[in-house]
Amino acid sequence: MASRITPTLSAPTSEATTDRRQDILNAALACAVDGGVDAVSIDGVRARCGASVGSIYHHFGNKDGIVAALFFDIFHDQSRSVQAQLDAARGVEAGVRALVTGYLDWVVAQPERARFLFQARSAVAAGPRTPDLAQAASRRNQALVAWFEPHRQAGAVRNLPCELMPSLVMGPVQSYCRAWLSGQEGPSALTSPAIYREELAAAAWRAVRA
């Protein structure tokens, strides 16, 4: 008689764990959309996704852990999206423009997640994952510096310290997107960044071109 092989349950279990984790993060984002970062709570998350208190604590420890985990998930998603646009660009001008439009397009496509990044940053910076935030921000910045350096050496961009380049290129689009996200409704609402996509990209290139 052929022996029966008991199917492994590790993959489904892992998938279920991942799904539950994501359910909790989605619920936390929904809380933040309704009332800001301060509205994220264990009870609020539990009510929205049906996770047990034990499950929430198992995955994230506490409310601060949920906020930080959601922040880093969104932060890394944004970084990957912008990096993909930069990698696809051909030439320094196209690359500079891709940094701006990649960031802008990501924000416009998912404003709730983008708003959470701005809102939660100070809370994460003041919490136990401060070193993780510093490391993630530094890693992203250093990747941009490394991209600009050969172009600076080749004379394609201004002969400025490359550590300044990310601020010159990304500063304006980040500032406008932040202002737009802070008040998307009412008579004082700003025009969507999508309308100024070309202007912001062109301004970034003018700021650094040789």
Where on the chain are the PLM-derived regions?
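C-terminal peripheral helix-coil segments that are non-catalytic and often amphipathic
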Residues: 1-8, 105, 138-153, 172, ...
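Amphipathic, non-transmembrane alpha-helical scaffold segments
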Residues: 17, 67, 71, 75, ...
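Generic hydrophobic, amphipathic alpha-helix propensity
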Residues: 20-28, 45, 70-74, 78, ...
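Helix-turn-helix
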Residues: 20-23, 31-65, 69
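Hydrophobic alpha-helical connector segments
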Residues: 69, 83-113, 165-169, 197
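Amphipathic alpha-helical packing segments from all-alpha helical-bundle domains
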Residues: 76-84, 127-154, 163-167, 175
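Amphipathic alpha-helical segments used for helix-helix packing
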Residues: 108-128, 178-182
